[in-house]
Amino acid sequence: MKESFGRLMIDIEGAALSSNDIELIENPHVGGLILFERNFVSKNQLIDLCAQIKSVKKNILVSIDQEGGRVQRLRQEFTNLPSMQTLGDIAEKTKNFSLLNDVGWLMASELIATGIDISFAPVIDVDRQTSSIIGCRSFSEIPEKVSKFAHEFINGMNKAGMQATGKHFPGHGSIEEDSHLTLPIDNRSLAQLMDHDLIPYFDLKDALSAIMCAHILFPKIDKTNAGFSPHWIQEILKKKIGFKGVIFSDDLSMKGASGFSYTDRVRISLDAGCDMVLICNNREGAIEAIKYMENNNISTSGSIASMMPKKKLSWKELEASNERNRIIKILQNIEEN
């Protein structure tokens, strides 16, 4: 029988669980927890925190954003990872595309050894050098290169036992605005997106285990924010593209998702086709979401179980690994040059 997970992902404030955190995690509707820099003091502390979380609830997906470059929540005692743009440029210049595989493996291995199940990675937005929020987080400005480089990175993650999440569907690379602060608007047509931003989603639909939806409005395609849109999620992502994996909302506390109560944000996201919704940095919003789920008998999800790591690894084993030491030396040479 497939394990069931609650469909809400929340955050915690500190470096250890509070009694309030434990009470929330124990709720059957909470099936995920996302970590931030504030939750990290040291590697051993983080290992203990992840173990504490799993002792409260076995069926909980522990996540983080450990992309590399400027979006890397864990730095001290973890390998400093280059941005995906830097990584793609080096791989292209040297024709050493296995480097992408290596870094995907290393990132995933360090997290799994710590007790973290997934990094929300890779970013498969196509960089058009207009986005304040994407930029160097993207592998390339060429869609086919994004697909090629991301596939190598995903293979590395999978080799370590971690499932990959592509983001931010349908594409954030052409947007100037930051959806954390406002609802970005993209006036391109679906045909234009099919020829550009959506190419990696078609190419990687079978390689990705999950996709995270963006809070962006495409008024020429649908009047609803893509993250809330059945047209985008059901008709385009699932039917037209053929994606069959897990679908995450982006953070519902972002300004790009505002204009509704948290109850409505959760309801609309789930109705649109999201398997799991994220509410970060707003405990009142998370509690409101739980009450909505309780009052409406929202079912748990069996599909989330597919995101759990397929391998186990300890830091002792990882630090003794010739593979890790080899990759770290390569990355050190990149930093020096």
Task: Annotate each predicted stretch with a short phrase.
Residues M1-V62, R70-F78, N337:
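N-terminal hydrophobic targeting/anchoring segments and the immediately downstream early-domain regions
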Residues V41-D48, A91-S109, E141-F149, A191-D195:
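Glycine-rich anion/phosphate-binding loops
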Residues I10, R38-I53, Q72, H151-N158, ...:
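Second-shell residues forming the walls of enzyme active-site clefts
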Residues I12-N27, L99-E110, D195-Y201, S261-I268:
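Short, acidic/polar
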Residues I298-S301, M308-N337:
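A short C-terminal boundary segment appended to hydrolase-like catalytic domains
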